[in-house]
Amino acid sequence: MKLEESLKKCPVIKRGEYNYFVHPITDGIPLVEPSLLREVACRILKIVDFSEVDKIVTAEAMGIHLATTLSLYTDIPFVIIRKRSYGLEGEIPVFQKTGYSKGQLYVNGIKEGDKVVIVDDVISTGGTMIAIIEALKRAGAEIKDIVCVIERGKGREIVEKKTGYKIKTLVKIDVVDGKVVIK
């Protein structure tokens, strides 16, 4: 499959002590091939039931292309959780901490009773996903499903234990000796 093959070839860089893999789905570089994006979207469509979903939710920035593609396939609108405040009525700020950064995220466009699917590019430490889940619960949304394209580390387990929500992923990886390894 294109996703797994492309992951095996992607470069790994250091961000402090964190080994960061650079991939089109997670970083938008070097080039996002339509065939790769299509494969990822079709694989998500096979494992997530969108039939009772009002909104697709993703975090800025690298979930945007995934949410856009899924929105086009399903005709379901999507909401982007942003890294800056717009000060709109009902905006929900939430603190996010990842393996290499921390800061505020801002949720707009979600109202009580919305049925949502969360889509993201990668789950690694679980920090972003926990923040998103907590914000959506505060907004009164019903989380129908959660899917991340790439699973790395213990983030999925941490999120599931802390929130009770199951996380679906397409591929599990690790970084060993400066290379991505499919598990």
Swiss-Prot record:
Please tell me whether the keyword Cytoplasm is annotated for this protein: yes
Q: Gene3D superfamilies, from UniProt?
A: 3.40.50.2020
Q: Mostly located where? A: cytoplasm
Known PROSITE patterns for this protein? PUR_PYR_PR_TRANSFER (PS00103)
A Pfam family of the record is Pribosyltran
Going by the UniProt record, its keywords in alphabetical order are: Cytoplasm, Glycosyltransferase, Purine salvage, Transferase
Per its record, the protein catalyses: IMP + diphosphate = hypoxanthine + 5-phospho-alpha-D-ribose 1-diphosphate; GMP + diphosphate = guanine + 5-phospho-alpha-D-ribose 1-diphosphate
Disulphides: none
Its pathway is: Purine metabolism; IMP biosynthesis via salvage pathway; IMP from hypoxanthine: step 1/1
Entry EC no(s): 2.4.2.8
Instruction: Tell me the GO molecular function terms.
Output: guanine phosphoribosyltransferase activity; hypoxanthine phosphoribosyltransferase activity
What InterPro entries does the entry give? HGPRTase-like, PRibTrfase_dom, PRTase-like, Pur/Pyrimidine_PRTase
UniProt GO cellular component terms: cytoplasm
- How does the annotation summarize its subunit structure? Homodimer.
Matching HAMAP family:
Hypx_phosphoribosyltr
Q: Which PANTHER family match?
A: HYPOXANTHINE/GUANINE PHOSPHORIBOSYLTRANSFERASE (PTHR43864), XANTHINE PHOSPHORIBOSYLTRANSFERASE (PTHR43864:SF1)
Q: What does this protein do?
A: Catalyzes a salvage reaction resulting in the formation of IMP that is energically less costly than de novo synthesis.
- The protein depicted here goes by the name Hypoxanthine/guanine phosphoribosyltransferase
Native organism? Methanocaldococcus infernus (strain DSM 11812 / JCM 15783 / ME)
